[in-house]
From Swiss-Prot:
Start and end residues of each stretch annotated as Disordered: 376-398, 428-566
GO cellular component: cytosol; plasma membrane
SUPFAM superfamilies per record: E set domains (SSF81296)
PANTHER family, A to Z: ARRESTIN DOMAIN CONTAINING PROTEIN, FI21816P1
Name of the protein: Probable HECT-type ubiquitin ligase-interacting protein creD
Function recorded in the entry: Component of the regulatory network controlling carbon source utilization through ubiquitination and deubiquitination involving creA, creB, creC, creD and acrB. May be involved in signaling by recognizing appropriately phosphorylated substrates via its arrestin domains and then recruit a HECT-type ubiquitin ligase such as hulA, leading to ubiquitination of the substrate, providing a link between ubiquitination and phosphorylation in protein regulation and stability.
Keyword Oxidoreductase: no
Amino acid sequence: MALSFFGGGGSASHAKYFDIRLDEDYIVFRGGEQEAASAHLSGKLILCLSEPLSIKHIRLHLTGISRVCWHLPSSSAGGGRKSWRERVFYEKTWRFREPGKGKTEILPAGNYEYPFNIVLEGSMPESVEGLSDTYVTYRFKAEIGRKYAKDIVVRRPLRIIRTLEPSALELSHAMSVENIWPNKIEYSISTPTKAVIFGTSIRVDFKLIPLLKGLKIGQIVSQLIESHDLTLNPEDPDSIRNTYKNTRTIINDEYELDADNALEIIDEAAEGYQFSRFLDLPKTLTRCLQDTDTKGIKIRHKLKFRVQLLNPDGHISELRATLPVSIFISPNLAIDDNNNLVDQTPQTAQRAVDDLAQQAPPLYGEHQFDQLYSELDPAGYRTPGPGSGPGTPFGTLSRNLSAENLASMNALTTTDISASALHSRLSNLHASRHSNPSPSESENQLESRLGVPTDYFGPSSGSNTHSLTSPELSRRPSDEVDHDHVPSGMATPFHPQYAEVETPEPCPKLFHSGPHFSEDVAIPAPQSPQQAHVRSANRSSSYFNPMDLLHHRPGYPGGHGDEEERQLRLMQARARV
Protein backbone atom coordinates (compact mmCIF):
# COMPACT_ATOMS: atom_id res chain seq x y z
CA MET A 1 0.00 0.00 0.00
CA ALA A 2 1.36 3.40 -0.95
CA LEU A 3 2.30 5.78 1.80
CA SER A 4 1.37 9.40 1.15
CA PHE A 5 1.86 12.38 3.43
CA PHE A 6 0.22 15.66 2.59
CA GLY A 7 1.16 17.68 5.65
CA GLY A 8 0.28 21.33 5.73
CA GLY A 9 3.81 22.66 6.16
CA GLY A 10 5.72 19.96 4.31
CA SER A 11 7.98 18.93 7.17
CA ALA A 12 11.41 17.64 6.30
CA SER A 13 10.69 14.49 8.30
CA HIS A 14 7.96 13.25 5.95
CA ALA A 15 7.89 11.78 2.45
CA LYS A 16 5.21 13.00 0.09
CA TYR A 17 4.82 9.65 -1.70
CA PHE A 18 6.43 6.26 -1.10
CA ASP A 19 5.31 3.08 -2.90
CA ILE A 20 6.37 -0.29 -4.34
CA ARG A 21 5.36 -0.81 -7.96
CA LEU A 22 5.60 -4.23 -9.59
CA ASP A 23 5.70 -4.80 -13.33
CA GLU A 24 3.44 -7.83 -12.81
CA ASP A 25 0.85 -8.14 -10.07
CA TYR A 26 1.70 -11.81 -9.49
CA ILE A 27 4.22 -14.46 -10.47
CA VAL A 28 3.03 -17.54 -12.38
CA PHE A 29 4.73 -20.94 -12.26
CA ARG A 30 3.45 -23.53 -14.75
CA GLY A 31 3.81 -27.09 -13.54
CA GLY A 32 4.96 -28.73 -10.34
CA GLU A 33 7.92 -27.71 -8.21
CA GLN A 34 10.18 -30.18 -10.00
CA GLU A 35 9.33 -29.11 -13.55
CA ALA A 36 8.33 -25.43 -13.49
CA ALA A 37 10.61 -22.88 -15.13
CA SER A 38 11.99 -19.84 -13.34
CA ALA A 39 10.17 -16.50 -13.39
CA HIS A 40 11.44 -12.94 -13.51
CA LEU A 41 10.28 -10.44 -10.89
CA SER A 42 10.91 -6.75 -11.47
CA GLY A 43 9.58 -3.42 -10.28
CA LYS A 44 10.45 0.02 -8.95
CA LEU A 45 10.55 1.73 -5.59
CA ILE A 46 9.02 5.19 -5.98
CA LEU A 47 9.89 8.08 -3.65
CA CYS A 48 8.62 11.65 -3.96
CA LEU A 49 10.01 14.40 -1.70
CA SER A 50 8.70 17.94 -1.54
CA GLU A 51 11.53 19.00 0.78
CA PRO A 52 14.98 17.62 1.59
CA LEU A 53 14.95 14.51 3.79
CA SER A 54 17.67 13.22 6.09
CA ILE A 55 18.02 9.42 5.82
CA LYS A 56 20.28 6.64 7.06
CA HIS A 57 19.37 4.12 4.34
CA ILE A 58 16.75 3.05 1.81
CA ARG A 59 16.13 -0.70 1.65
CA LEU A 60 13.67 -3.15 0.17
CA HIS A 61 13.03 -6.61 1.63
CA LEU A 62 11.22 -9.61 0.12
CA THR A 63 10.32 -12.29 2.66
CA GLY A 64 8.59 -15.66 2.32
CA ILE A 65 6.86 -16.93 5.47
CA SER A 66 5.04 -20.21 6.13
CA ARG A 67 2.82 -20.84 9.12
CA VAL A 68 1.00 -24.02 10.15
CA CYS A 69 -1.45 -23.87 13.04
CA TRP A 70 -4.48 -25.78 14.29
CA HIS A 71 -6.70 -25.79 17.35
CA LEU A 72 -7.75 -28.98 19.06
CA PRO A 73 -11.27 -28.84 20.52
CA SER A 74 -11.67 -28.63 24.26
CA SER A 75 -12.75 -31.68 26.23
CA SER A 76 -14.26 -32.27 29.63
CA ALA A 77 -10.83 -33.08 31.03
CA GLY A 78 -9.25 -29.81 29.98
CA GLY A 79 -9.26 -26.85 27.61
CA GLY A 80 -8.31 -26.76 23.99
CA ARG A 81 -4.75 -26.97 22.74
CA LYS A 82 -3.10 -24.95 19.98
CA SER A 83 -0.22 -26.21 17.87
CA TRP A 84 1.61 -23.94 15.50
CA ARG A 85 4.93 -23.29 13.82
CA GLU A 86 6.14 -20.33 11.76
CA ARG A 87 9.31 -20.07 9.71
CA VAL A 88 10.96 -17.78 7.17
CA PHE A 89 12.01 -19.80 4.13
CA TYR A 90 13.02 -16.98 1.76
CA GLU A 91 14.73 -13.60 2.17
CA LYS A 92 16.07 -11.04 -0.29
CA THR A 93 17.23 -7.46 0.41
CA TRP A 94 18.00 -4.59 -1.98
CA ARG A 95 20.05 -1.69 -0.58
CA PHE A 96 19.58 1.47 -2.62
CA ARG A 97 21.13 4.11 -0.29
CA GLU A 98 23.76 3.26 2.34
CA PRO A 99 25.75 6.31 3.56
CA GLY A 100 27.61 4.13 6.02
CA LYS A 101 27.40 2.98 9.59
CA GLY A 102 26.29 5.82 11.83
CA LYS A 103 26.16 8.29 8.95
CA THR A 104 23.25 10.14 7.42
CA GLU A 105 22.50 11.56 4.01
CA ILE A 106 20.24 14.40 2.94
CA LEU A 107 18.11 13.69 -0.12
CA PRO A 108 17.14 16.83 -2.03
CA ALA A 109 13.52 17.38 -2.92
CA GLY A 110 12.43 15.58 -6.07
CA ASN A 111 11.23 12.28 -7.49
CA TYR A 112 13.28 9.10 -7.12
CA GLU A 113 12.95 5.69 -8.74
CA TYR A 114 14.94 2.67 -7.63
CA PRO A 115 14.49 -0.33 -9.97
CA PHE A 116 14.90 -3.88 -8.72
CA ASN A 117 14.65 -7.35 -10.25
CA ILE A 118 15.29 -10.96 -9.36
CA VAL A 119 14.84 -14.42 -10.85
CA LEU A 120 12.64 -16.69 -8.75
CA GLU A 121 13.25 -20.42 -8.99
CA GLY A 122 10.36 -22.57 -10.21
CA SER A 123 10.65 -24.74 -7.10
CA MET A 124 9.56 -21.95 -4.76
CA PRO A 125 6.34 -22.62 -2.83
CA GLU A 126 3.15 -21.05 -4.11
CA SER A 127 1.05 -18.67 -2.06
CA VAL A 128 -1.55 -20.35 0.14
CA GLU A 129 -4.00 -17.88 1.64
CA GLY A 130 -7.53 -18.22 2.94
CA LEU A 131 -7.21 -20.05 6.25
CA SER A 132 -7.13 -18.08 9.46
CA ASP A 133 -3.84 -19.26 10.99
CA THR A 134 -2.28 -21.35 8.22
CA TYR A 135 -0.70 -19.76 5.17
CA VAL A 136 2.27 -19.33 2.84
CA THR A 137 2.78 -15.66 1.97
CA TYR A 138 5.33 -13.33 0.37
CA ARG A 139 5.68 -9.73 1.53
CA PHE A 140 7.60 -6.71 0.30
CA LYS A 141 8.76 -4.22 2.90
CA ALA A 142 10.38 -0.92 1.91
CA GLU A 143 11.86 1.29 4.59
CA ILE A 144 13.55 4.65 4.82
CA GLY A 145 15.76 4.66 7.91
CA ARG A 146 16.16 7.90 9.82
CA LYS A 147 18.42 8.73 12.73
CA TYR A 148 16.29 10.83 15.02
CA ALA A 149 12.81 10.00 13.77
CA LYS A 150 10.59 7.04 13.09
CA ASP A 151 11.37 5.00 9.99
CA ILE A 152 9.09 5.37 6.99
CA VAL A 153 7.79 1.91 6.05
CA VAL A 154 5.52 0.67 3.26
CA ARG A 155 4.44 -2.95 2.63
CA ARG A 156 3.04 -4.81 -0.34
CA PRO A 157 2.03 -8.47 -0.71
CA LEU A 158 3.26 -10.66 -3.56
CA ARG A 159 1.20 -13.58 -4.83
CA ILE A 160 2.85 -16.56 -6.48
CA ILE A 161 0.46 -18.74 -8.48
CA ARG A 162 1.23 -22.30 -9.49
CA THR A 163 -1.01 -23.32 -12.35
CA LEU A 164 -1.17 -26.32 -14.66
CA GLU A 165 0.71 -26.65 -17.91
CA PRO A 166 -1.38 -26.72 -21.10
CA SER A 167 -0.26 -30.32 -21.66
CA ALA A 168 -1.28 -31.51 -18.18
CA LEU A 169 -3.32 -34.69 -18.20
CA GLU A 170 -5.79 -33.20 -15.75
CA LEU A 171 -6.96 -30.81 -18.48
CA SER A 172 -7.65 -33.45 -21.12
CA HIS A 173 -8.74 -36.57 -19.25
CA ALA A 174 -12.35 -36.98 -18.19
CA MET A 175 -13.11 -38.51 -14.81
CA SER A 176 -15.94 -41.00 -14.51
CA VAL A 177 -17.29 -43.71 -12.28
CA GLU A 178 -19.65 -46.25 -13.81
CA ASN A 179 -20.87 -49.64 -12.75
CA ILE A 180 -23.89 -51.92 -12.55
CA TRP A 181 -25.77 -52.65 -9.37
CA PRO A 182 -27.24 -56.07 -10.18
CA ASN A 183 -31.02 -56.05 -10.41
CA LYS A 184 -31.00 -52.39 -9.36
CA ILE A 185 -29.48 -49.78 -11.63
CA GLU A 186 -26.78 -49.11 -14.17
CA TYR A 187 -25.12 -45.76 -13.57
CA SER A 188 -22.43 -43.47 -14.96
CA ILE A 189 -21.29 -40.23 -13.29
CA SER A 190 -18.57 -38.20 -14.98
CA THR A 191 -16.89 -34.79 -15.26
CA PRO A 192 -15.36 -33.47 -18.52
CA THR A 193 -11.96 -32.83 -16.88
CA LYS A 194 -10.33 -33.49 -13.56
CA ALA A 195 -8.93 -29.94 -13.24
CA VAL A 196 -11.28 -27.03 -12.57
CA ILE A 197 -10.45 -23.32 -12.46
CA PHE A 198 -11.04 -21.60 -9.15
CA GLY A 199 -14.13 -19.38 -9.29
CA THR A 200 -15.83 -21.25 -12.17
CA SER A 201 -18.21 -24.22 -12.04
CA ILE A 202 -17.99 -28.01 -12.18
CA ARG A 203 -20.19 -29.85 -14.65
CA VAL A 204 -21.34 -33.29 -13.60
CA ASP A 205 -23.02 -35.62 -16.11
CA PHE A 206 -25.40 -38.29 -14.82
CA LYS A 207 -26.64 -41.37 -16.65
CA LEU A 208 -29.01 -43.60 -14.66
CA ILE A 209 -30.67 -46.69 -16.15
CA PRO A 210 -33.03 -48.64 -13.82
CA LEU A 211 -32.78 -52.42 -14.15
CA LEU A 212 -35.71 -53.21 -11.83
CA LYS A 213 -39.25 -52.63 -12.95
CA GLY A 214 -40.93 -50.01 -10.79
CA LEU A 215 -37.63 -48.59 -9.43
CA LYS A 216 -37.70 -44.80 -9.06
CA ILE A 217 -34.92 -42.25 -8.58
CA GLY A 218 -35.16 -40.18 -5.40
CA GLN A 219 -33.00 -37.31 -4.19
CA ILE A 220 -29.58 -36.82 -5.78
CA VAL A 221 -26.98 -35.11 -3.57
CA SER A 222 -23.66 -33.81 -4.93
CA GLN A 223 -21.01 -32.48 -2.54
CA LEU A 224 -17.58 -30.92 -2.98
CA ILE A 225 -15.39 -31.91 -0.04
CA GLU A 226 -12.12 -30.16 0.84
CA SER A 227 -9.58 -32.00 3.01
CA HIS A 228 -6.74 -30.37 4.97
CA ASP A 229 -3.62 -32.29 6.00
CA LEU A 230 -1.41 -30.06 8.15
CA THR A 231 2.07 -30.99 9.35
CA LEU A 232 4.18 -28.90 11.71
CA ASN A 233 7.55 -30.29 10.64
CA PRO A 234 7.26 -31.87 7.18
CA GLU A 235 11.04 -32.42 6.94
CA ASP A 236 11.00 -34.60 10.05
CA PRO A 237 10.46 -38.33 9.32
CA ASP A 238 8.56 -38.64 12.62
CA SER A 239 6.13 -35.90 11.62
CA ILE A 240 3.20 -38.29 11.81
CA ARG A 241 2.89 -37.29 15.46
CA ASN A 242 2.41 -33.62 14.55
CA THR A 243 -0.21 -34.02 11.84
CA TYR A 244 -3.73 -32.69 11.86
CA LYS A 245 -6.49 -33.61 9.40
CA ASN A 246 -9.72 -31.82 8.79
CA THR A 247 -12.44 -31.67 6.14
CA ARG A 248 -15.10 -29.17 5.20
CA THR A 249 -17.97 -29.14 2.72
CA ILE A 250 -17.61 -26.51 0.01
CA ILE A 251 -20.72 -27.24 -2.08
CA ASN A 252 -23.87 -29.17 -1.25
CA ASP A 253 -26.23 -29.59 -4.20
CA GLU A 254 -29.55 -31.43 -3.79
CA TYR A 255 -31.63 -32.35 -6.82
CA GLU A 256 -34.74 -34.40 -7.50
CA LEU A 257 -36.08 -35.53 -10.84
CA ASP A 258 -39.33 -33.82 -11.75
CA ALA A 259 -42.41 -35.70 -12.79
CA ASP A 260 -41.90 -34.26 -16.24
CA ASN A 261 -38.56 -36.05 -16.57
CA ALA A 262 -39.80 -39.20 -18.24
CA LEU A 263 -37.61 -42.07 -19.25
CA GLU A 264 -35.69 -41.51 -22.47
CA ILE A 265 -33.80 -43.78 -24.81
CA ILE A 266 -30.08 -43.84 -23.93
CA ASP A 267 -27.50 -45.20 -26.35
CA GLU A 268 -30.31 -46.65 -28.49
CA ALA A 269 -30.43 -49.66 -26.20
CA ALA A 270 -32.00 -48.86 -22.84
CA GLU A 271 -34.38 -46.44 -21.15
CA GLY A 272 -33.13 -44.21 -18.37
CA TYR A 273 -32.38 -40.71 -17.16
CA GLN A 274 -29.62 -38.51 -18.52
CA PHE A 275 -28.95 -34.99 -17.23
CA SER A 276 -26.19 -32.60 -16.04
CA ARG A 277 -25.66 -30.51 -12.93
CA PHE A 278 -23.45 -27.41 -12.58
CA LEU A 279 -21.78 -26.81 -9.22
CA ASP A 280 -20.68 -23.17 -8.83
CA LEU A 281 -17.43 -22.72 -6.91
CA PRO A 282 -17.02 -19.91 -4.35
CA LYS A 283 -15.39 -16.66 -5.49
CA THR A 284 -13.19 -16.24 -2.42
CA LEU A 285 -10.25 -18.24 -1.09
CA THR A 286 -11.60 -18.08 2.44
CA ARG A 287 -14.31 -20.56 1.45
CA CYS A 288 -12.38 -22.69 -1.03
CA LEU A 289 -8.64 -23.17 -1.47
CA GLN A 290 -6.70 -24.45 -4.45
CA ASP A 291 -5.11 -27.89 -4.48
CA THR A 292 -1.58 -27.70 -3.11
CA ASP A 293 1.06 -29.62 -1.21
CA THR A 294 3.79 -27.32 0.10
CA LYS A 295 5.45 -26.44 3.40
CA GLY A 296 3.36 -28.89 5.41
CA ILE A 297 0.04 -27.74 3.91
CA LYS A 298 -1.78 -30.29 1.76
CA ILE A 299 -5.16 -29.42 0.27
CA ARG A 300 -7.23 -31.88 -1.78
CA HIS A 301 -10.78 -31.96 -3.18
CA LYS A 302 -13.23 -34.67 -4.18
CA LEU A 303 -16.84 -34.98 -5.31
CA LYS A 304 -19.19 -37.23 -3.35
CA PHE A 305 -22.55 -38.40 -4.72
CA ARG A 306 -25.54 -40.02 -3.09
CA VAL A 307 -28.48 -41.23 -5.18
CA GLN A 308 -31.62 -42.52 -3.46
CA LEU A 309 -33.30 -45.52 -5.08
CA LEU A 310 -37.00 -46.03 -4.28
CA ASN A 311 -37.66 -49.76 -4.61
CA PRO A 312 -41.11 -51.15 -5.55
CA ASP A 313 -41.43 -52.89 -2.16
CA GLY A 314 -41.11 -49.55 -0.35
CA HIS A 315 -37.61 -49.62 1.12
CA ILE A 316 -34.97 -47.05 0.08
CA SER A 317 -31.52 -47.91 -1.21
CA GLU A 318 -28.68 -45.45 -1.64
CA LEU A 319 -26.05 -45.37 -4.36
CA ARG A 320 -22.74 -43.75 -3.36
CA ALA A 321 -19.85 -42.72 -5.56
CA THR A 322 -16.76 -40.50 -5.37
CA LEU A 323 -14.74 -38.65 -8.01
CA PRO A 324 -11.45 -36.79 -7.48
CA VAL A 325 -11.24 -33.20 -8.69
CA SER A 326 -8.38 -30.70 -8.75
CA ILE A 327 -8.90 -26.94 -8.31
CA PHE A 328 -6.23 -24.52 -9.51
CA ILE A 329 -5.94 -20.75 -9.83
CA SER A 330 -5.93 -19.28 -13.33
CA PRO A 331 -3.77 -16.22 -14.09
CA ASN A 332 -6.71 -14.88 -16.12
CA LEU A 333 -8.82 -14.43 -12.98
CA ALA A 334 -7.25 -11.76 -10.81
CA ILE A 335 -7.47 -12.02 -7.01
CA ASP A 336 -7.28 -8.94 -4.80
CA ASP A 337 -5.49 -8.50 -1.49
CA ASN A 338 -8.55 -9.77 0.38
CA ASN A 339 -8.40 -13.12 -1.49
CA ASN A 340 -11.52 -12.39 -3.53
CA LEU A 341 -11.94 -12.52 -7.30
CA VAL A 342 -11.77 -9.03 -8.76
CA ASP A 343 -14.32 -9.78 -11.48
CA GLN A 344 -16.96 -12.26 -10.39
CA THR A 345 -19.25 -12.11 -13.44
CA PRO A 346 -20.12 -15.37 -15.25
CA GLN A 347 -18.77 -13.93 -18.50
CA THR A 348 -15.30 -13.55 -17.01
CA ALA A 349 -15.33 -17.10 -15.67
CA GLN A 350 -16.41 -18.45 -19.05
CA ARG A 351 -13.68 -16.45 -20.76
CA ALA A 352 -11.06 -18.04 -18.50
CA VAL A 353 -12.38 -21.51 -19.37
CA ASP A 354 -12.24 -20.72 -23.09
CA ASP A 355 -8.68 -19.43 -22.84
CA LEU A 356 -7.62 -22.60 -21.08
CA ALA A 357 -9.27 -24.74 -23.77
CA GLN A 358 -7.31 -22.91 -26.46
CA GLN A 359 -4.01 -23.57 -24.69
CA ALA A 360 -4.53 -27.33 -24.51
CA PRO A 361 -2.70 -29.38 -27.16
CA PRO A 362 -4.80 -30.61 -30.11
CA LEU A 363 -6.39 -34.01 -29.86
CA TYR A 364 -5.30 -36.85 -32.12
CA GLY A 365 -8.54 -36.63 -34.08
CA GLU A 366 -7.67 -33.10 -35.19
CA HIS A 367 -4.78 -34.23 -37.38
CA GLN A 368 -6.69 -33.04 -40.45
CA PHE A 369 -5.33 -29.58 -39.69
CA ASP A 370 -1.80 -30.74 -40.51
CA GLN A 371 -0.30 -29.45 -43.76
CA LEU A 372 -0.62 -31.90 -46.63
CA TYR A 373 2.21 -32.74 -49.00
CA SER A 374 0.09 -31.75 -52.00
CA GLU A 375 -0.10 -28.21 -50.63
CA LEU A 376 3.68 -27.73 -50.65
CA ASP A 377 5.26 -25.57 -53.34
CA PRO A 378 7.36 -27.87 -55.59
CA ALA A 379 9.46 -24.93 -56.87
CA GLY A 380 13.14 -25.55 -56.34
CA TYR A 381 12.87 -29.32 -56.01
CA ARG A 382 15.17 -31.40 -58.25
CA THR A 383 12.42 -33.10 -60.23
CA PRO A 384 12.57 -33.72 -64.03
CA GLY A 385 10.25 -31.51 -66.04
CA PRO A 386 7.09 -32.66 -67.84
CA GLY A 387 9.06 -33.27 -71.04
CA SER A 388 11.42 -35.74 -69.40
CA GLY A 389 10.61 -39.43 -69.53
CA PRO A 390 9.96 -41.35 -66.31
CA GLY A 391 13.07 -43.47 -66.78
CA THR A 392 15.52 -40.77 -67.77
CA PRO A 393 18.79 -41.15 -65.81
CA PHE A 394 20.88 -38.31 -64.52
CA GLY A 395 24.16 -37.46 -66.16
CA THR A 396 26.40 -39.02 -63.55
CA LEU A 397 24.28 -42.21 -63.47
CA SER A 398 23.98 -42.83 -67.23
CA ARG A 399 25.85 -45.76 -68.74
CA ASN A 400 26.48 -44.04 -72.11
CA LEU A 401 27.12 -40.40 -72.82
CA SER A 402 24.86 -38.88 -75.45
CA ALA A 403 26.24 -38.38 -78.98
CA GLU A 404 25.67 -34.66 -78.86
CA ASN A 405 27.96 -31.70 -78.62
CA LEU A 406 28.33 -31.49 -74.81
CA ALA A 407 31.68 -29.95 -74.13
CA SER A 408 30.56 -29.19 -70.60
CA MET A 409 30.51 -32.89 -69.76
CA ASN A 410 34.28 -32.71 -69.21
CA ALA A 411 33.60 -30.63 -66.09
CA LEU A 412 30.90 -32.98 -64.82
CA THR A 413 31.12 -33.49 -61.09
CA THR A 414 29.43 -35.84 -58.73
CA THR A 415 26.34 -33.62 -58.60
CA ASP A 416 23.45 -34.38 -60.94
CA ILE A 417 22.57 -32.05 -63.78
CA SER A 418 19.41 -30.03 -63.58
CA ALA A 419 16.14 -31.31 -64.99
CA SER A 420 15.89 -28.52 -67.59
CA ALA A 421 19.41 -29.16 -68.93
CA LEU A 422 18.74 -32.89 -69.14
CA HIS A 423 15.52 -32.30 -71.05
CA SER A 424 17.29 -29.98 -73.52
CA ARG A 425 20.10 -32.47 -74.18
CA LEU A 426 17.70 -35.34 -74.74
CA SER A 427 15.75 -33.22 -77.24
CA ASN A 428 18.93 -32.38 -79.17
CA LEU A 429 19.97 -36.03 -79.14
CA HIS A 430 16.61 -37.06 -80.57
CA ALA A 431 16.97 -34.52 -83.39
CA SER A 432 20.56 -35.53 -84.18
CA ARG A 433 19.61 -39.19 -84.73
CA HIS A 434 17.45 -38.22 -87.73
CA SER A 435 20.41 -36.65 -89.57
CA ASN A 436 23.29 -38.79 -90.93
CA PRO A 437 26.79 -37.78 -89.94
CA SER A 438 29.24 -36.97 -92.70
CA PRO A 439 31.23 -40.07 -93.76
CA SER A 440 34.34 -37.96 -94.07
CA GLU A 441 34.32 -37.07 -90.38
CA SER A 442 37.23 -38.73 -88.74
CA GLU A 443 37.03 -40.76 -85.58
CA ASN A 444 39.47 -38.53 -83.79
CA GLN A 445 37.42 -35.44 -84.55
CA LEU A 446 34.26 -37.12 -83.28
CA GLU A 447 35.95 -38.25 -80.10
CA SER A 448 37.37 -34.80 -79.43
CA ARG A 449 33.96 -33.20 -80.06
CA LEU A 450 32.38 -35.49 -77.48
CA GLY A 451 35.09 -34.79 -74.93
CA VAL A 452 36.40 -38.38 -74.90
CA PRO A 453 40.15 -38.62 -74.17
CA THR A 454 42.29 -40.01 -76.95
CA ASP A 455 43.94 -42.59 -74.72
CA TYR A 456 40.66 -43.92 -73.40
CA PHE A 457 40.44 -46.87 -75.79
CA GLY A 458 44.04 -47.87 -75.32
CA PRO A 459 46.66 -48.23 -78.10
CA SER A 460 45.18 -47.99 -81.59
CA SER A 461 46.32 -47.25 -85.15
CA GLY A 462 44.63 -46.69 -88.45
CA SER A 463 41.16 -48.01 -88.93
CA ASN A 464 41.49 -50.95 -86.59
CA THR A 465 39.63 -48.99 -83.91
CA HIS A 466 36.53 -48.62 -86.06
CA SER A 467 33.39 -50.50 -85.08
CA LEU A 468 29.70 -50.22 -85.55
CA THR A 469 27.38 -48.56 -83.11
CA SER A 470 26.63 -50.76 -80.11
CA PRO A 471 23.15 -52.25 -80.09
CA GLU A 472 20.79 -51.99 -77.13
CA LEU A 473 22.53 -54.91 -75.41
CA SER A 474 25.59 -52.73 -74.98
CA ARG A 475 23.92 -51.13 -71.94
CA ARG A 476 24.61 -54.26 -69.93
CA PRO A 477 27.44 -53.84 -67.41
CA SER A 478 30.75 -55.38 -68.29
CA ASP A 479 32.30 -57.93 -65.99
CA GLU A 480 35.78 -56.69 -66.85
CA VAL A 481 35.23 -53.16 -65.57
CA ASP A 482 36.13 -52.19 -62.05
CA HIS A 483 33.19 -49.93 -61.22
CA ASP A 484 34.76 -48.78 -58.00
CA HIS A 485 37.35 -46.71 -59.87
CA VAL A 486 35.62 -45.86 -63.16
CA PRO A 487 32.94 -43.15 -62.97
CA SER A 488 29.46 -43.91 -64.21
CA GLY A 489 29.00 -43.16 -67.91
CA MET A 490 32.62 -44.01 -68.73
CA ALA A 491 32.49 -47.76 -68.13
CA THR A 492 31.35 -48.47 -71.72
CA PRO A 493 33.46 -47.29 -74.70
CA PHE A 494 31.78 -45.05 -77.21
CA HIS A 495 31.46 -46.34 -80.81
CA PRO A 496 30.71 -43.84 -83.59
CA GLN A 497 28.14 -44.55 -86.28
CA TYR A 498 28.99 -45.12 -89.95
CA ALA A 499 26.12 -44.89 -92.38
CA GLU A 500 27.59 -46.05 -95.68
CA VAL A 501 28.75 -49.65 -95.74
CA GLU A 502 29.46 -51.49 -98.99
CA THR A 503 28.73 -55.19 -98.80
CA PRO A 504 28.37 -57.76 -101.60
CA GLU A 505 25.61 -59.35 -99.60
CA PRO A 506 23.14 -57.92 -97.05
CA CYS A 507 24.71 -57.53 -93.66
CA PRO A 508 23.22 -60.01 -91.17
CA LYS A 509 21.01 -58.57 -88.46
CA LEU A 510 22.37 -59.19 -85.00
CA PHE A 511 20.01 -60.96 -82.66
CA HIS A 512 19.26 -59.79 -79.16
CA SER A 513 19.17 -63.26 -77.68
CA GLY A 514 20.78 -66.57 -78.52
CA PRO A 515 19.11 -69.06 -80.90
CA HIS A 516 16.95 -71.83 -79.59
CA PHE A 517 18.53 -75.18 -78.94
CA SER A 518 16.43 -76.88 -81.63
CA GLU A 519 17.50 -74.31 -84.22
CA ASP A 520 21.12 -74.83 -83.34
CA VAL A 521 20.86 -78.53 -84.12
CA ALA A 522 19.03 -77.98 -87.43
CA ILE A 523 21.56 -75.46 -88.81
CA PRO A 524 23.81 -76.88 -91.57
CA ALA A 525 27.55 -76.80 -91.44
CA PRO A 526 28.89 -73.26 -91.18
CA GLN A 527 30.47 -71.55 -94.13
CA SER A 528 33.35 -69.17 -94.23
CA PRO A 529 32.26 -65.64 -93.42
CA GLN A 530 32.02 -63.03 -96.13
CA GLN A 531 34.17 -59.93 -96.17
CA ALA A 532 32.66 -56.47 -96.32
CA HIS A 533 34.36 -53.29 -97.54
CA VAL A 534 34.03 -50.28 -95.26
CA ARG A 535 34.81 -46.71 -96.19
CA SER A 536 37.26 -45.07 -93.86
CA ALA A 537 38.53 -41.54 -93.44
CA ASN A 538 42.14 -42.79 -93.31
CA ARG A 539 42.07 -45.51 -95.99
CA SER A 540 40.17 -45.87 -99.22
CA SER A 541 39.03 -49.37 -98.36
CA SER A 542 39.38 -51.80 -95.52
CA TYR A 543 38.00 -55.08 -94.44
CA PHE A 544 35.19 -55.46 -91.93
CA ASN A 545 35.84 -58.42 -89.70
CA PRO A 546 32.88 -59.72 -87.64
CA MET A 547 35.34 -60.77 -84.96
CA ASP A 548 36.31 -57.13 -84.49
CA LEU A 549 32.67 -56.29 -83.91
CA LEU A 550 32.32 -58.92 -81.23
CA HIS A 551 35.62 -57.98 -79.71
CA HIS A 552 34.63 -54.31 -79.31
CA ARG A 553 31.06 -54.93 -78.23
CA PRO A 554 30.69 -54.02 -74.57
CA GLY A 555 29.06 -56.39 -72.23
CA TYR A 556 30.82 -59.63 -73.39
CA PRO A 557 33.45 -60.94 -71.05
CA GLY A 558 36.81 -61.88 -72.46
CA GLY A 559 38.20 -65.40 -72.69
CA HIS A 560 39.21 -68.01 -75.31
CA GLY A 561 36.11 -70.16 -74.79
CA ASP A 562 33.79 -67.23 -75.08
CA GLU A 563 35.55 -66.11 -78.29
CA GLU A 564 34.92 -69.43 -80.01
CA GLU A 565 31.29 -69.44 -78.91
CA ARG A 566 30.71 -65.97 -80.34
CA GLN A 567 32.31 -67.01 -83.67
CA LEU A 568 30.06 -70.05 -83.87
CA ARG A 569 26.90 -68.03 -83.20
CA LEU A 570 27.80 -65.40 -85.78
CA MET A 571 28.46 -67.98 -88.49
CA GLN A 572 25.20 -69.76 -87.67
CA ALA A 573 23.33 -66.48 -88.04
CA ARG A 574 24.93 -65.79 -91.45
CA ALA A 575 24.07 -69.28 -92.65
CA ARG A 576 20.37 -68.62 -92.09
CA VAL A 577 20.39 -65.53 -94.31
